[in-house]
A protein has these predicted regions:
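N-terminal beta1-alpha1 cap of cysteine-dependent amidohydrolase-like domains
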Residues: 1-95, 99-109, 114, 122-130, ...
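Amide-donor transfer/coupling interface in amidating biosynthetic enzymes
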Residues: 2, 39-44, 82-84, 118-262
Length: 262
């Protein structure tokens, strides 16, 4: 197929749009940055894209709660299009604020298939903004964005958030997430073992750092792969200057998946 087409969906307060755009372009996708208004007024259509990227930042200033207003705008006019987009097997990725939006929309974890909100990303257990590089373990590489990683592989990725503590509506939802291996990314310490704060920077239940839906085409995570697409943007890049940044494999996995599928 020709290069997969991706849209980086923005609104007031989002950030890292350019990092996401360049990551997609340099992984072989055709990408553009699109304001949510263009989808709301039908200037653009979701059906014209193979991947939607919901960027990080503080959409609408994170008023009410993180991601709530952006999710409300999507629900008002675009929710059926988004649901069809996912059902068709096309890809959605949301780091940080994007993850918060996906949770609000019910696209993740969506264990009952009802597109209802089953979880939340609450205030960090430290009650402060956490911004640093952390260790992440890949638990399941069946997700379209993780195919270039090995299960059990330990990654170093940056975080920057105030509301990242993953909690579920009830024990049943959490049990479904764990039994279906939807907890594709976990916070770990430098030895690759699950631990508490500060290794788990927000106090997420079961050290969950990222979720993928059961279909494998929607990924939400608190870390920012787009910030470490290039080797020189990694915090310890002077220790090993060879190869690509860790984020590169997230985007290459997605582009290769789309080329194979479509």
């Amino acid at each position: 197929m020709k290069n997969p087409k991706a849209a980086v969906l923005t609104m007031e307060g989002t950030n890292n749009e350019m990092e996401a755009y360049l990551s997609l372009i340099h992984s072989g996708a055709s990408a553009e940055i699109v304001h949510i208004k263009k989808f709301e007024n039908s200037e653009k259509k979701l059906d014209d894209y193979d991947l939607i990227f919901l960027p990080g930042g503080f959409s609408a200033g994170d008023y009410i709660r993180a991601g709530a207003i952006m999710a409300a705008r999507i629900k008002a006019k675009l929710i059926r299009d988004i649901e069809r987009f996912v059902d068709d097997g096309r890809l959605v990725m949301g780091p940080c604020n994007g993850f918060q939006v996906l949770i609000e929309l019910g696209l993740l974890p969506n264990t009952e298939g009802k597109w209802e909100t089953e979880a939340a990303l609450a205030q960090n257990i430290s009650n402060r903004f956490e911004a640093r590089t952390i260790y992440i373990r890949v638990n399941n590489n069946k997700c379209a964005f993780l195919k270039r990683f090995s299960e059990g592989e330990i990654l170093k990725l940056p975080i920057a958030h105030m509301e990242g503590r993953f909690v579920t509506r009830d024990e049943k939802v959490l049990n479904e997430i764990m039994s279906r291996r939807m907890n594709v990314l976990s916070y770990v310490n430098s030895e690759g073992k699950e631990s508490g704060y500060p290794w788990n920077p927000n106090g997420s239940v079961m050290n969950i750092a990222g979720l993928c839906n059961e279909k494998g085409n929607v990924l939400g995570l608190m870390p920012h792969p787009e910030r470490v697409f290039y080797k020189f943007t990694e915090s310890d890049w002077t220790r090993n200057r060879n190869g690509e940044g860790t984020g590169y494999r997230f985007f290459l996995s997605a582009v290769e998946h789309m080329k194979e599928k479509f």
